[in-house]
């Protein structure tokens, strides 16, 4: 079975991508040493309705298999759900040789992964992503839950035993989720695979093109970009911060819009455009910002919401995990495939963000006409 190999300081594992990888789930579980004592599948209501039974049927093992389904929505990564899953794990007598399977998108992967990282000080888990966005979050071992004051503020680094990307699970995604996930694909192309970036521009005219063999190809190109960075910096002490390209403003937009009102990918798309806009200004270079803006609008990515206040966005950006002593630090670009983290003054960010917001509104109006 063809796979993408992930090598980190703490673990080696494989990512399997394709139309039939679910049939390999039993083999993946049975290969684990020590032997798995029992299994708990964690999912949400939306995904469970569509796919939970398929996963149970694919898992042909003699050990007990339990499932725990949480309500769907933006509060999936809450402390309440985290506590509830731990309670279910204890009630079902999971132990240190148990296995958790995360069946769902990025939020389920994060929640289930953090449960695995903390239950009895750490047990094994497998990621079974069901969204395009999760091609990013399912790889690399960052797991977390949210706090009312910030996203992903309570978490750990806990690598999965394997990732099984059964692409037919993505068929049920609404268009906004395809768009959200595609933003992370674009991010990986821009920061680490320029050839993929050009391929996307030539071969993915609309989001409907991301199906079948093209989808598998895109995943097999995008995931290794992250894998290479994670291999160099598993716990985000250095170059792993490059994966936050577009996320400084993106996270601020999510928070100020109210979590759930703008998708993660839409926020990241706007954030990437701003990072390129700012990079052109700071380094006096041409990164083809206007061309990229039109390309993003072609896929339906939104402009920066007009009602959001620049002052408030800047303040939220100062709370970003990359910030240092209240100084904003962003991932900027000097060339495609070449990014780095830079400290930027509040004044520079404020001035550039005001100009960017005006330019995005103008671009939206011109595109509408």
UniProtKB/Swiss-Prot annotation:
Per the entry, the cofactor note is: Binds 1 divalent metal cation per subunit. Can use either Co(2+) or Zn(2+).
Q: Which Pfam families match?
A: DHQ_synthase, DHQS_C
Q: Name one GO biological process term.
A: chorismate biosynthetic process
What chemistry does it catalyse, as a reaction equation? 7-phospho-2-dehydro-3-deoxy-D-arabino-heptonate = 3-dehydroquinate + phosphate
Binding, NAD(+): 72-77, 130-131, 142, 151
The Enzyme Commission number assigned here is: 4.2.3.4
Q: What class of enzyme is it?
A: lyase
Question: Which family does the record assign?
Answer: Belongs to the sugar phosphate cyclases superfamily. Dehydroquinate synthase family.
Its recorded name reads: 3-dehydroquinate synthase
């Amino acid at each position: 079975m063809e796979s993408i190999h992930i090598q980190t300081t703490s673990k080696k594992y494989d990512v399997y991508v394709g139309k039939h990888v679910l049939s390999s789930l039993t083999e993946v579980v049975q290969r684990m040493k020590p032997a798995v004592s029992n299994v708990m599948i964690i999912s949400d209501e939306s995904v469970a309705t569509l796919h939970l039974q398929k996963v149970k049927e694919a898992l042909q093992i003699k050990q007990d298999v339990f499932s725990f389904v949480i309500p769907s929505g933006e509060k999936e990564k809450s402390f309440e759900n985290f506590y509830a899953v731990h309670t279910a794990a204890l009630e079902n007598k999971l132990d240190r040789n148990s296995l958790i399977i995360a069946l769902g998108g990025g939020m389920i992967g994060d929640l289930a992964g953090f449960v695995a990282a903390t239950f009895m000080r750490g047990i094994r888990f497998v990621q079974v992503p069901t969204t395009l966005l999760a091609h990013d979050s399912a790889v690399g071992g960052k797991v977390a839950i949210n706090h009312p004051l910030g996203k992903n503020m309570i978490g750990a680094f806990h690598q999965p035993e394997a990732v099984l990307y059964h692409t037919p699970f993505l068929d049920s995604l609404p268009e906004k989720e395809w768009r959200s996930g595609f933003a992370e694909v674009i991010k990986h192309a821009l920061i680490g695979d320029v050839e993929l970036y050009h391929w996307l521009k030539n071969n993915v005219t609309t989001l409907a093109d991301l199906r079948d063999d093209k989808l598998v190809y895109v995943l097999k190109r995008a995931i290794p970009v992250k894998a290479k960075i994670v291999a160099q910096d598993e716990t985000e002490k250095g170059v792993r911060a490059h994966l936050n390209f577009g996320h400084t403003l993106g996270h601020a937009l999510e928070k100020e819009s109210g979590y759930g009102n703008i998708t993660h990918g839409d926020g990241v798309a706007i954030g990437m455009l701003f990072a390129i806009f700012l990079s052109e200004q700071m380094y006096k270079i041409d990164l083809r910002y206007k061309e990229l803006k039109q390309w993003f609008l072609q896929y339906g990515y939104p402009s920066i919401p007009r009602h959001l206040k620049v002052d408030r966005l800047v303040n939220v950006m100062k709370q970003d995990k990359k910030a240092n002593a209240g100084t904003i630090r962003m991932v900027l670009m000097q060339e495609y495939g070449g990014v780095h983290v830079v400290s930027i003054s509040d004044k520079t960010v404020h001035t550039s963000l005001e100009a960017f917001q005006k330019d995005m509104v103008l671009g939206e109006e011109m595109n509408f006409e």
